[in-house]
From Swiss-Prot:
Comp. bias (Low complexity): 143-158
Biological role stated in the UniProt entry: Transcription factor; part of the gene cluster that mediates the biosynthesis of GKK1032, fungal natural products containing a macrocyclic para-cyclophane connected to a decahydrofluorene ring system that show potent antitumor activities.
Superkingdom of the source species: Eukaryota
Record keyword ATP-binding present: no
Annotated segments matching region Disordered: 1-40, 115-158, 231-257
Protein name according to UniProt: Transcription factor gkaF
Ranges of compositional bias, category Basic and acidic residues: 1-19
Keyword Cytoplasm part of the UniProt annotation: no
Protein's cellular compartments: Nucleus
Disulfide bonds: none
Amino acid sequence: MGRPQRGDTAKERRERQDKVTSPPESGPISQSGLSDTVDWTSETNENMWLAYDFDERKDINQARGQDIHRDQELFDVVLQNNMSDDQFASTSASVSDDWYDTGFDQAFLQPSSTSTTAYSVEPSPFISIEPPTLTKETKKRNSQSSDSSKPSSTSSQSLIERVTSLNLDLHQQSIIAGQIVDEFGNIDPDMIDPLHKDNRLSFAVDSMTQGLQNFHSLLLEIINTANGTTFSSESASPHVNRPPIQQQQSPSRFLAPPSRSCVPSLFCFREGNSSQQQSKNNATGIDLPTSLMIISCHIHLIRLCRHVFAGIRAALSSKDQHQQALLVLSSCQVGGVSISHDSDLKLLILIQVVARLINKIGVLLGYPCSPADLSNSAVGNLGNATEDERKKMLLPQLLRFVLAQEGVAGQSSHGDGMEGLREEIRKLNEVLATS
């Protein structure tokens, strides 16, 4: 039997497809029929794969066309939506994955994660402020200025604390000395027992002399710190731009100069061309609170001296108790020297020492006259001061007010200041002269 024609093959293919789709008839199947069925099935399957392959390719191409058309529509929609936003026009779809925040004010675009090489971050638009690079000379100059300013501020603070402490101590000592004078004033002189254990006159004398020396030493140190001058025992003239005397040195190193012309006054820093004078002498000046504290110390010190001399005069008022009172005072030391052989001589030396120290303190405070000229009855006058001496005063009006209250400038006073001290010393000299 020959090979079938192409037309018959198509016809047979349709018939065979109909047979395959129709259910087989029930009944016994013979061996020959089974073999025929297998042959038909294999041939049919071979032809069917060809048909299905063509149909599948057709369906796949159609699906691909639909997907391409759908993607084109989606791309058109996205493009239309993003045309109004230029920010995302040049970015890719992976921008959201590669965007990270490095701070509240900086944001950078990280390179692609597929790159394994090191990357450099773009510079921030914000300029970082860094300290300028200092040269060696600038660093050395800054270190020297800081080192020199720290000891100066520390020394000034220490001096202020010492002035405050001394002012409080002098105030308390003056109150105690005033109580001693009141006790002697309320008791008959013949009933006073200088040898009594409660007699505090000897301690009052010690506190007076020690207070004068401490105040004079501290006043010199304050002036030295303020204007950079130092007094030493080798020379009477001040040495400019030398470091101030250390605190551990004994007060005996502070020697007052013999004349007023070479003494830097406490009240000479804020008049006229004071800024030029300060820059010339490297002077820092003395502030107003420190100046007022110094004046307060001076007032309490003069009051203490007046009370002490009033107590000594009251103890020596009785002739019977005169020798006993001198025996009590004989234990006192004047300037570290004890004179036990002659008590009258000791009292005279005590008066001279107090007068001398008060004169030195007055000159350092800028008094244009000798406020403690206790040997003379005449009182100094501010009118005797020269024009240069007036310009040296820091607060002329305040100084005049203080001197007027203390009875220095020939004005009336309540007998509680310098004039009262002069009166007490004059009366004590009379007692010593009649003894």
